[in-house]
Amino acid sequence: MKRAFVFTLLWAFCLACFAQQTLESYEELTDTKPHDGPEVWSQIGSPVQLSWGSVDIRYKKLDVPDVKQSSRLRKKAWKGERIHAQAVLWTNKDLKNVTLKMGDLKSGSSVIPSSAVSTHFVRYVMTDELNPGGGGCGHRENKAEWDSSLVADMLDIAQELDIKANSTRPIWVKVWVPADAKAGKYRGTLTVSGEGMKPMDLTLEVDVLNRTLSAPKDWAFNLDLWQNPYAVARYYNVPLWSKEHFDLLRPVMKMLADVGQDAITASIMYKPWNGQTEDHYDSMIGRMKKLDGTWSYDYTVFDKWVTFMKEDIGIDGLISCYTMIPWALRFDYYDQATSRIQFVEAKPGEEAYKEYWVTFLKDFARHLREKGWFEQTSISMDERPLEDMKAAIAVIRQADPEFKITLAGNYHEEILDDLYYLAIPYGHKFPAEVKARRAEKGQISCVYTCCTETFPNIFTFSDPAEAAWTPIHAVAGGYDGFLRWSINSWTADPLRDSRFRTWAAGDTYSIYPGPRSSIRFERLMEGLQDCEKIRLLREEFKSKGATGKLNRLNKVLAKFTPEGMKEGKQTAAEMVQELDALLNSL
């Protein structure tokens, strides 16, 4: 017994050490793809080289980068906007303890402080590929069956990094221009230094325009990126809903708030998606069937989570409660008579289903009204058949006719009026007149992507510009916003391997543990900022009667559609570049 106890302590200690190690330093996986050999690297001239690159390119780790040498980069920005740039460092000799430093950006006596600038080594993760027929859905249990490679994606929080000979290391720079900055041309210097190299400098110039971007909390675009608090507890090996858990959740969720996240993801049943992710969702609400056959409900965890998101994080939109139609139609409860967890197995439309849910929903509505949350709470479903949706809606209406109902799934005319929020898949048709009618009633109409789409997507092998293109498409299509099913459902080894047993690599997360951002998340943020810029400019042009400018904007925006992409005249990167240039010139 004593040996077992000691072993348990040692094992727990090892797990804690592993979690800490993954946060500070780790080795990237080996890329087995063909790459430039020593004979190519020996021809690069100077043994260590540095240049500005493009944010649209994922530079390969073991190839000499194809870049046009540039030591000066010019960017334009609105006040309050975050802009980013990518530099590239490559070397044919080992470098130790390489560091990045970016000082203040100055324009005369005006300053954008260094505290508004962040620099990151871009790290490489393992990815895979699309299915043979396109898309990324389906099981991938055997990783050897898929063409895998290393790709640049994660933005590290490490302060220094060793760089091996014959390798490339991208560097990401982000500047969050203060909302009260003075318009003008600012200049700063990125310095890269380390053992085995002389300090090297790149100049960044930021032309701050006399326009101001709203704060993220005020963006009109409706954003719903599903959160998974259970993944955070597992990765860091901390008890669910403990102080340690919430402390670790806080910076992850703050990243969401900083891109204008609206919705809070809440799970109101055990395994709403049948444990499809590495870390399944538990129910945030306890259910107990008492000895006398009546029910009692424990909202402690639900209340903690919602209060944390609203008050600590500042995400205060729809509380999306999943789900009444899970993948496996088994509904858990604690049975006081047997002192065991039991399950009700019932389909929508059956009496047992109605009894289980009506009783709960009535009490849930009571609790939500007491908390003052009823008006912002929805009972949410995703990708469920029409007949099941009809049956679930009938149960919800019986319990409380005022409950909001949401669906991320196919367009069904028959239930439109019942859906406060509806997100349909990219490429599906949502009639413009229906969207307009829903808007008049205060209903929300959005678009979503998942593993299905070959384009646009945010897999770790997707072109970076696709992440920016996607929310802009939502605005171009007349939608109110964008939904994506997962932002932090981490894999078993998320810092090094983005592949998963189901779906294409990177589908389950774009924020890494740490938390660390990614090229994909930063580009998504770029697109979301553009959406708010478009709204502000449209309002201004309409109020001033600037028809010419409005038409120019709408003409470029109209390209961000499936039809526009099919024409094949521009890549997603070219379209985003064209729009950015226009938004900064109008």
Put a short name on every predicted segment.
Residues 421-503:
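Catalytic-core region of carbohydrate-active enzymes that cleave or remodel glycosidic bonds
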Residues 1-22:
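Bacterial Sec-dependent N-terminal signal peptides
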Residues 320, 404-406, 446:
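Structural detector of well-ordered beta-strand residues that form the stable sheet scaffold
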Residues 330-333, 341, 345-411, 479, ...:
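Catalytic domains of carbohydrate-active enzymes that cleave complex glycans
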Residues 406-429:
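Aromatic- and acid-rich polysaccharide-binding/catalytic face
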Residues 19-274, 374, 568-586:
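Mature N-terminal, pre-catalytic/accessory segment of carbohydrate-active enzymes
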Residues 79, 182, 247-248, 300-301, ...:
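Short, glycine/acidic-rich beta->alpha junctions
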Residues 146-147, 161, 176, 187-194, ...:
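Aromatic-lined carbohydrate-binding surfaces of glycoside hydrolases
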